[in-house]
C-alpha cells in the first residue's frame, strides 16, 4: 500500500488563527476567559452554575440582581459554549476595537446585558406568565448583529433575493427565526430582546450610557491603563470613532446598494 507523500492541508491556517488570537483586545480576552471558566465550573456536580447564574424571571430580586450580568457568561454544555465563542469573538473584538476597552466594559457590563434581560423578564413573566430560564452569550451575538445591521442599512439599505429587495436591517430577524426553528432549546424571545437593544445601539439611542471621552481619557491617564494593561484599546486608538461607520462602496443608482446574503453570519442559541 502506497504511503501518501504529505498530509492533506488543514481547512484553516493555524498560524493565522494563532496570530488573530494574539491580537485580540483586552476586554474580548477577558470575556472569553470568563465564559471558559464558567463552563469548567459547570463540570463539577456539587454546585450548579446554571441554576445560580441563569436569567430566571421568578428568581430576580434584590439579592439576585447579579443574574442580569451573569447569564451571558454561562452555557449549557461544551457545544453551546464553543459555538457561541466562535460567533461572539469577531463581533466583540470589532466593537472593542472601534469604541475602546473602557467603553466596551461600561456597555457590556451595563445596558447591553441588563436591558435585554429587562425586556425578557417583562414579557416572559408579566405577559406570557412563564418562567423559562435562559443563559448564553448569544444575547450579545444577536445584539451586535442588530447594531451592525443598522449601520449596514445606513450605507447599504437593501440586499437582493432574486428580484426582491429586502432591507438589510431585517437580516438579524431572519437569523433569529432560523435559529429558533433549526436549533433546539433556543429562546426566540431572548434573541429578539437582544436584537431590539442592538437596533437602539446602532441608532445611537444608547449614547447617553457611554461615559464622556474626557472622563475616559482622565481615567486612562490617571491609571496609566495603556502602559500597564497589554492589549488595552484606549480612547485615542479607536478604529472608526465612537458610533461612526466607514462607507464600503460608492453610491449606486437610486441610492440603493445591494448586500450579499452572507451578511447573516453564524448565530447560536440563548438558553438551555
Swiss-Prot record:
Q: Name one GO cellular component term.
A: membrane
Q: Name one GO molecular function term.
A: serine-type endopeptidase activity
Compartments, as annotated in UniProt: Membrane
Question: Do you know which InterPro entries this protein is assigned to?
Answer: Peptidase_S54_rhomboid_dom, Rhomboid-like_sf
Q: Any stretches that span the bilayer, and where are they? A: 30-50, 72-92, 103-123, 133-153, 164-184, 186-206
Protein keywords: Hydrolase, Membrane, Protease, Serine protease, Transmembrane, Transmembrane helix
What membrane topology does the UniProt entry give?
Answer: Multi-pass membrane protein
Cite the active-site annotation. Answer: 138 (nucleophile), 191
> Could you give a single Gene Ontology term from the biological process aspect?
proteolysis
This entry's Enzyme Commission designation comes to 3.4.21.105
Q: What class of enzyme is it?
A: hydrolase
**Which reactions are catalysed by this chain?**
Cleaves type-1 transmembrane domains using a catalytic dyad composed of serine and histidine that are contributed by different transmembrane domains
* Function of the molecule: Rhomboid protease that catalyzes intramembrane proteolysis. Required for transcription factor srbA activation by mediating its release from the membrane and thereby regulating its activity under hypoxic conditions. Essential for iron homeostasis and resistance to azoles such as voriconazole. Required for virulence in murine models of invasive pulmonary aspergillosis (IPA).
Q: Which family does it belong to?
A: Belongs to the peptidase S54 family.
Q: Output this protein's name.
A: Rhomboid-type serine protease B
